[in-house]
């Protein structure tokens, strides 16, 4: 590939946006906790591989800016000493298991080579982790400071904002708390936001403006059904009436990656997600390496490819990488054709925005990071039609856009709210409504409990701690992850327990704040359990 870079002859833009989010799961009361493995798997399979890819682009002097949304709960977990220590233990256990597998598969060359592949991958991840001091947030921050990526935020606990619209101060608290957390992580204000589940309701812009956020992303129909209808469809953003830019998801680039029937990840040459040695091998053999010693689970070592509906065949790494290369070329060709068909129809170069969950790449789709790497390299070196751009840079170049009010929408099934509001999770919302009203009442009651420049009394300091913890518990209860899990049925008991635990803790704090005393020992225990947002501002509910 001949060396090239982006230049003025480009006919259009492509914006790649990856959304990295996991619910806040941290259980210091247990030595091992199954749901903490959600983070450990994503670090090993997605977040570190993405950082390794970005480091290779830096090494090769590739200017391929992408946008990454890092949610506040994810950043909190990635910065938490307890979870970081547990991740190191988990990673060392994976390396030990890979070494055992090398010995076990000694007489079978095909399986032995795969065992060595995993050993090499895991040791490389450990080396990267150690080289960055176990601080992945700082590694992303450095790339942003160098201008190689743009990091955006999302709502504080990934709450579905339209379902909080009856109590707007909760929307405000979700957005401003996220802004504050971003400042603590990255030393600046976020310019863009990933609205959780791309869920939009008119009025959210007021709080985005207060947080100095300039743009957000919607699903395709959120833009296409805007009023008035957008002249350029999703191929240019619109400004909401208060000047916040809304970018629409490009349907074609989404379909080619996400679609169960047409999407690339379903190719039979790719690694099968579900066939894991944690389920296939003798339980006593894999037990020391499982997320929970009481039950089988994923280890990350998987020897089979998707194959088809019948018996699975052994994974062939070279064939999978060939598929990734073919798909990267096809994806690029499709984007080039798309841009060329649109050239001249707009008053500026057309833009295709492709937002994806980051965890699709590497975790769910094992070869997904290689696909991104190959696509970026082909785009950078082999064509002169498309320029990779961030939405923030697009707005700098094209500051004038049509004004329109987007349609209420999400990127969930059927495009609206039913994934998060249905007969499996509707019980949550009346309780949230009451808690939100009580939080606002507390904020109003204690509005004079603020710093006056004098040393606060012990009683005032204790009340401030209780108010902050009440804010944390309400924010955690509002997470969209819990109703999503309840609807999907993947870990419903855990999701149900989390909602109830946070609401009960909130009720306890509310009752103490409206009575004559606060149980400091209990408060301290709750603070240690749910330690997200150390500087949570309860006054946002006023």
Identify the meaning behind each predicted range:
Residues 199, 204-213, 229:
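Hydrophobic, small-residue-rich alpha-helical packing segments that form membrane-like cores
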Residues 155-177:
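Glycine-rich phosphate-binding "P-loop"
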Residues 9-10, 55-63, 135-152, 183-186, ...:
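Acidic (Asp/Glu)-rich catalytic clusters
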Residues 69-74, 155, 192-201, 221, ...:
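Short, solvent-exposed turn/loop segments enriched in Gly/Ser/Thr/Pro and often Arg
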Residues 170-195, 334-355:
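CE4/NodB-like, metal-dependent polysaccharide N-deacetylase domain
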Residues 189-200, 357-361, 491:
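Conserved short loop/turn motifs at secondary-structure junctions
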Residues 160, 213-226, 389-390:
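His/Asp/Glu-enriched short active-site or ligand-binding loop at hydrolase and phosphoryl-transfer sites
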Residues 9-63, 70-112, 228-542:
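Active-site and substrate-binding clefts of carbohydrate-active enzymes
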């Amino acid at each position: 590939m001949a060396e090239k870079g982006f230049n003025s002859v480009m006919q259009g833009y492509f914006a790649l946006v990856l959304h990295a989010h996991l619910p806040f799961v941290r259980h210091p009361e247990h030595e091992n906790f199954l749901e903490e493995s959600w983070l450990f798997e994503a670090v090993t399979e997605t977040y570190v591989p993405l950082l390794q890819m970005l480091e290779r682009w830096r090494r090769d002097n590739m200017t391929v800016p992408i946008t990454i949304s890092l949610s506040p709960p994810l950043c909190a977990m990635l910065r938490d000493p307890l979870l970081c220590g547990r991740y190191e233990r988990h990673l060392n256990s994976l390396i030990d298991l890979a070494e055992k597998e090398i010995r076990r598969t000694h007489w079978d060359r095909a399986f032995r080579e795969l065992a060595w592949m995993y050993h090499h991958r895991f040791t490389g991840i450990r080396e990267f982790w150690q080289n960055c001091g176990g601080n992945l947030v700082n590694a992303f921050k450095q790339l942003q400071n160098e201008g190689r990526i743009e990091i955006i935020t999302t709502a504080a606990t990934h709450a579905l904002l339209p379902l909080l619209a009856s109590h707007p101060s909760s929307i405000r608290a979700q957005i401003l708390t996220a802004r504050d957390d971003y400042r603590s992580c990255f030393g600046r204000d976020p310019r863009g936001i990933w609205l959780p589940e791309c869920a939009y309701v008119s009025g959210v812009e007021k709080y985005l403006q207060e947080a100095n956020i300039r743009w957000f992303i919607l699903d395709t129909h959120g833009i296409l059904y805007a009023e008035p209808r957008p002249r350029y469809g999703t191929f240019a953003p619109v400004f909401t009436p208060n000047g916040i830019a809304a970018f629409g998801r490009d349907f074609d680039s989404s379909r080619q990656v996400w679609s169960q029937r047409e999407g690339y990840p379903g190719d039979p040459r790719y690694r099968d997600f579900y066939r894991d040695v944690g389920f296939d091998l003798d339980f006593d053999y894999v037990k020391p390496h499982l997320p929970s010693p009481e039950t089988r689970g994923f280890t990350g070592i998987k020897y089979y490819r998707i194959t088809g509906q019948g018996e699975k065949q052994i994974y062939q790494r070279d064939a999978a990488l060939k598929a990734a290369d073919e798909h990267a070329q096809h994806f690029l060709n499709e984007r080039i054709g798309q841009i060329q068909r649109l050239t001249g129809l707009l008053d500026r170069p057309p833009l295709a925005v492709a937002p994806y969950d980051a965890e699709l790449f590497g975790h769910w789709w094992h070869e997904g990071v290689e696909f991104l790497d190959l696509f970026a390299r082909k785009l950078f070196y082999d064509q002169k039609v498309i320029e990779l751009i961030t939405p923030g840079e697009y707005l700098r170049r094209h500051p004038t856009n049509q004004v329109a009010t987007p349609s209420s929408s999400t990127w969930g099934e059927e495009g609206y709210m039913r994934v998060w509001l249905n007969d499996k999770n509707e019980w949550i919302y009346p309780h949230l409504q009451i808690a939100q009203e009580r939080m606002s009442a507390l904020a109003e009651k204690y509005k004079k409990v603020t710093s006056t420049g004098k040393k606060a009394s012990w009683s005032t300091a204790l009340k401030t701690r209780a108010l902050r913890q009440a804010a944390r518990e309400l924010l955690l209860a509002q997470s969209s992850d819990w109703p999503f899990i309840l609807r999907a049925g993947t870990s419903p008991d855990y999701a149900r327990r989390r909602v109830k635990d946070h609401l009960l803790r909130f009720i306890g704090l509310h009752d103490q704040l409206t009575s004559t005393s606060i149980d400091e020992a209990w408060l301290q225990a709750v603070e240690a359990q749910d330690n997200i947002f150390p500087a949570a501002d309860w006054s946002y509910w006023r």
